Amino acid sequence: MPHYRRILLKLSGEALLGDGQYGIAANTLDRIADELAEINAMGVEVAVVIGGGNIFRGAGLAASGMDRVTADHMGMLATVMNALAIQDALERRSVFCRVMSAIKINQVCEDYIRRRAVRHLEKGRVVIFAAGTGNPFFTTDSAASLRAVEVGAELLLKGTKVDGVYSSDPVRDPEAKRYQQLTYDEVLSKRLEVMDATAIVLCRDQAMRIMVFDITSPGTMVAAARGEPVGTVVDPGLPSAQEESS
């Protein structure tokens, strides 16, 4: 039996890279689609927010002089491309799926309307939210927090390249400690790289539970949807974080 009724998965665009430096790796896309299809078959209602960093990173060009709003709009379009790729992969697995965009591009996908999104989820369709919040200066992490709250998700799953939240970069620091559980305020005060501060504050204010897990580890996403203890949990929780050795 699934542990959660409705979840939202936040994927960075880089999660689709695989071993490449740019674009979408077919084998990585297929693995993620397989796991999403398995979760959907369990009866869990699944929403997805996808980034676009595998195709375009606006921050770099903005730092080089491009107008920030223009750069962010280009990044939004990159997320639409990724969303369409995931939709196609799911439909090839006979999973009903809808892409909903925060910016109008309705010859390609639906406009985001909250009530319609909830109805799609209730009908068992996977819903992929594209184009972030539709506003510049907001990250796709903030979009994930916002959409999770709006559609009433019980869990926000944040897929990363490591198996949880660490006290420092575990690649560079062999002494880094992995947290099993954190509160929202601990994430903010310790400046831990879970999500940006705007996203964390929204989750805190709405008591949206976050689970950070390793998206590159096959089966971990499904295990998280079953309620198994994977990665790091961020919630109102305990007043002090629990750590374990990396």
From Swiss-Prot:
Regulation: Inhibited by UTP.
Quaternary structure note: Homohexamer.
Pathway(s) served: Pyrimidine metabolism; CTP biosynthesis via de novo pathway; UDP from UMP (UMPK route): step 1/1
GO cellular component, one term: cytosol
Record's catalysed reaction(s): UMP + ATP = UDP + ADP
Presence of keyword Iron-sulfur: no
Residues that, per the record, bind UMP: 52, 72, 133-140
Annotated compartments: Cytoplasm
Main function: Catalyzes the reversible phosphorylation of UMP to UDP.
Keywords attached to this entry: ATP-binding, Cytoplasm, Kinase, Nucleotide-binding, Pyrimidine biosynthesis, Transferase
One GO MF term attached to the UniProt entry: ATP binding
Similarity section: Belongs to the UMP kinase family.
Protein name, entry field: Uridylate kinase
CDD domains xref list: AAK_UMPK-PyrH-Ec (cd04254)
Upper lineage: Bacteria, Pseudomonadati, Pseudomonadota, Gammaproteobacteria, Chromatiales
Documented EC number(s): 2.7.4.22
Record GO biological process: 'de novo' CTP biosynthetic process; UDP biosynthetic process
Top-level EC class as recorded in UniProt: transferase
Annotated Pfam families: AA_kinase
Keyword ATP-binding applies: yes
Residues noted as binding ATP in the record, renumbered to the chain: 10-13, 53, 57, 160, 166, 169
